[in-house]
Amino acid sequence: MIIFPAIDIKDSKCVRLIKGDFDKMTSYENSPFDQAKIYFQSGFRNIHIVDLDGALEGRSSNSNIIKQILKNLNLKIQIGGGIRTIDDVNNWIKSGVDKVIMGTAAVENIDLLKTVCERFKNKIAVSLDVKDGFISLSGWKKQTNISAIDFVKKIENFGVSRIIYTDINKDGTKKGPNIKDTVELSSKVKIPFVISGGISSIKDIKKIKSLNDSNIEGVIVGKSIYDGDIKINELAKQI
């Protein structure tokens, strides 16, 4: 199972949100590059990065910071936030990212998703931000009436390399992930899932690992690292 430490970037800073609420945002001292370096030096090789400015504005405004990380650290990065066009996807892949995460654009333009999956094989991940079973878009500002299960079924044969499933009700709360819903949804399709939102302890990580579920590819850990609830060296032992 892959453990993805997270870096969320807004206004060139590392931040975390609670339940996707930008009014409940905490900024942290370390720069995104310094944080990535800490992860790298601790033994992590897979990093989850979200450009929150990009998610809100529909275009990446922190790309130079992310490219600095790519250039200087030997990391496999999955990048999301503001990726809405084929050019966006192409630019990130040329920059050297491992996976490009499509969220809003994947849901609003399913033909685009199909096209990029065909063109960039095994490079496209889809981020599903889910609240009460329904997908949210645009940095969680827009709630839809599209059910997560219906959407996942629709894209099952496109060639999506992984689905990042975030339960917005759990995200940033450190109250434990929504393992039940993620496992249930992942069992219905052939696409690997990554669990995101609410990880609060090493115990949560061990619980997910103990499932030994081939449909669960990994887990994203964010706020609990920044707040010191999970120590990096302890998390590294779970790699």
Describe every region a protein language model picked out.
Residues 8, 39, 47, 92, ...:
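Conserved, mostly hydrophobic/aromatic
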Residues 41, 48-95:
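N-terminal active-site wall of soluble small-molecule enzyme domains
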Residues 111-119, 209-239:
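C-terminal helical cap(s) of enzyme catalytic domains, especially alpha/beta-barrels
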